[in-house]
Regions:
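Long, intrinsically disordered low-complexity tandem-repeat segments
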Residues: 17-26
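Basic polycationic patches enriched in arginine
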Residues: 28-31
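GST-like fold's C-terminal all-alpha helical module
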Residues: 158, 162-250
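Acidic/histidine-enriched, glycine/proline-rich intrinsically disordered or flexible terminal extensions
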Residues: 259-273
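GST-like domain detector, emphasizing the conserved glutathione-binding G-site
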Residues: 2-4, 8, 26, 36, ...
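Active-site-flanking alpha-helical
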Residues: 132, 224-225, 256
């Protein structure tokens, strides 16, 4: 094979002289693969252009009644605040399992439930923590460590507390009860919620609970704002301004509009107190 390799090299100068005349044909043929490579590169960029729709198709949020379910509202607002595209799956409120959750008869609340890229997350606070990790630019938790701890604490308090208010002032966006009489235990819950709001707005400057950025806490307390409207709860100026601000958020307005057009009623909740 060494001899064959030397044979072309040891040829006379006449062979190379003819080679250049034929050589252009070969380079021209060689240009064809280069063109194909450019074409394939252009095709490779196409999936990037449709990446947002792919992301949306791999994220789904399961909720139930928009009129009655405060937990569904919290999970939905968190997902909207995060900026994560998602499809919405709505379970009918007359489904036995979801009905039990809305009526506070379920031992565990599994709605809302977020599925994102194969990861299934339920429980509103778990969804909030997950969204904060996958969508950090949304800043669902404050950057400052002390503010972040405070945000988690009051979100947890909303998550596990205020049972008297929940049971006596259930969420019902289509209803309105002027001069609704609030019993003492529910009033204690309302007083505590207002104290939380005032402390946060005074500490972090407002207009939201932790400053200029909406956080997990705002999503957690948004359904309370709707309850205060439904049951005609009187608030001080600071708390009323915060309620008005939250009810004016585009995402909250979208939710309320959808709730008003929701066909299903739950007789146990859709009554005059």
């Amino acid at each position: 094979m060494a001899t064959l390799a030397k044979t072309p090299a040891s040829s006379t100068n006449k062979a190379p002289a003819k080679a250049p005349a034929k050589a252009p044909a070969k380079p021209r043929a060689a240009r064809s693969p280069t063109t194909k490579a450019a074409t394939s590169t252009a095709k490779a960029k196409a999936p990037a252009a449709v990446a947002p729709s792919v992301s949306a198709s791999t994220s789904a949020l399961t909720i139930t009644s928009k009129n009655y379910s405060s937990w569904s509202m919290r999970g939905w607002l968190l997902t909207r605040f995060s900026g994560l595209p998602f499809t919405e799956n709505v379970l009918p409120p007359d489904d036995p399992s979801t009905r039990a959750e809305i009526l506070l008869l379920s031992s565990s609340i599994l709605v809302p439930c977020l599925v994102h890229n194969g990861v299934r997350v339920w429980d509103t606070l778990a969804i909030a923590e997950y969204l904060n990790e996958v969508c950090p630019d949304a800043q669902l938790l404050p950057a400052d460590v002390i503010a972040r701890a405070h945000c988690r604490a009051i979100s947890g308090e909303m998550h596990s507390g205020f049972s008297a208010m929940r049971s006596s002032l259930p969420m019902n966006l289509r209803a309105h009860f002027p001069k609704f009489k609030i019993w003492s235990r529910a009033q204690s819950d309302i007083d505590r919620i207002c104290a939380i709001w005032r402390e946060c707005i005074e500490t972090y400057g407002g207009p939201f609970l932790f400053g200029e950025q909406r956080t997990t806490a705002d999503a957690m307390y948004a359904p309370v704002c709707t309850r205060f409207i439904t049951y005609d709860v009187k608030l001080d100026k600071v708390c009323q301004a915060y309620c008005d601000l939250m009810l004016a958020q585009p995402e909250v307005k979208d939710w309320i509009e959808a709730a008003k057009s929701e066909p299903a009623d739950i007789d146990e909740l859709d009554v005059e107190f």
